[in-house]
């Protein structure tokens, strides 16, 4: 996945916005799952891509398989630059 803003899908942008708004959690594992507002995202492949691209990360270390609040990395903030707040 490219981290260039023009290369992100609308779904990826919406997921990043949810993380930025503090509404998302990551399941800590080698393939981190994402849930928003307590519900699993329908596109976990994109969630994995966002984590592996270094755009999102958990706010704290937890045991493997446990959930932690998600936050944007510096790269994640840069990727959202230029997109309006409303999805």
Model-inferred region functions:
Residues 27, 58-59:
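A local structural micro-motif
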Residues 32, 63-64:
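Residue-level "edge-of-site" marker
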Residues 7, 37-58, 64-67:
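Short amphipathic alpha-helical interaction segments
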Residues 65-87:
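Short, amphipathic alpha-helical interaction segments positioned at domain boundaries
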Residues 2-45:
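Short amphipathic alpha-helical interface segments
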């Amino acid at each position: 996945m490219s981290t260039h803003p023009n290369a992100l899908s609308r779904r990826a942008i919406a997921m990043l916005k949810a993380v930025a708004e503090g509404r998302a959690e990551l399941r800590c594992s080698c393939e981190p799952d994402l849930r928003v507002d307590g519900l699993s995202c329908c596109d976990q492949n994109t969630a994995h891509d966002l984590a592996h691209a270094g755009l999102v990360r958990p706010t704290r270390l937890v045991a493997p398989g446990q959930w932690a609040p998600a936050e944007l990395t510096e790269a994640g903030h840069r990727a959202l630059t230029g997109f309006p707040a409303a999805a």
